[in-house]
Design a protein with these regions (language model features):
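Absolute protein N-terminus
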Residues: 1-2, 160
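Active-site-proximal alpha-helix that buttresses catalytic centers in soluble enzyme cores
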Residues: 2-84, 88-91, 95, 127-130, ...
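Glycine-rich phosphate-binding loop signature in dinucleotide/nucleotide-binding domains
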Residues: 45-47, 99-104
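Residue-level signal for well-ordered alpha-helical positions
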Residues: 66-67, 121-122, 145
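Short, well-ordered coil/turn elements that cap or connect secondary structure elements
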Residues: 73-75, 103, 149
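Non-DNA-binding regulatory cores of transcription-related proteins
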Residues: 101-107, 112-138
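Domain-level recognition of soluble alpha/beta enzyme cores
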Residues: 126-153, 159-160
Length: 160
């Protein structure tokens, strides 16, 4: 299976007055534009996901919607995954996502520092290794036989 880790696109700046609940910050126009480009790159590279799991936070949910639209997936393939809005724990994420076929590609849309931590867990079994810069709208692909810590191989890393 291929797991695509996607950091949400650029969102509105933190502003307690405009967004008292940080989870409600929406994407800004530049973030939407960059995410469309990154999503089209996946299509060009033949890495279109079969399903997209997303943190429920507005900026991640909107990023997932762009990913679906640009890759031609129906909206039913965007699935809420609350575990993507918290520190990474592979068994918990695996339990929420369920069965993934060996030829399937899934995308997980979330936040920093949790996306780089999840990448570290899947690649090395340690959320602190390798230390990486995971910018907004970046997409990191990891090949796995099963969704288990320390068993992944880096397939791609696209940075806008």
């Amino acid at each position: 299976m291929l797991v695509l880790l996607v950091r949400h696109a650029q969102a509105a700046e933190q502003d307690a007055e405009a967004f008292p609940d940080d989870t409600e910050r929406p994407l800004v126009p530049k973030g939407r534009r960059v995410q469309r480009q990154m999503s089209r790159l996946l299509v060009k590279k033949g890495l279109t996901p079969d399903r997209v799991y997303s943190s429920p936070w507005t900026r991640a949910w909107q990023t997932a919607r762009i990913l679906l639209r640009e890759t031609g997936l129906p909206k039913e393939q965007r699935i809420r995954a609350d575990t993507l809005a918290m520190p990474p724990d592979v068994p918990t994420i695996a339990a929420e996502i369920g069965e993934i076929g060996p030829e399937e590609t899934i995308a997980l849309v979330g936040h920093e520092p949790w996306m780089s931590g999840l990448a570290g867990l899947l690649l090395t079994g340690d959320s602190a290794l390798p230390r990486m810069d995971f910018p907004k709208s970046a997409i990191l692909g990891i090949e796995l036989e099963r969704l288990e810590a320390g068993t992944g191989t880096l397939r791609c890393f696209f940075v806008p």
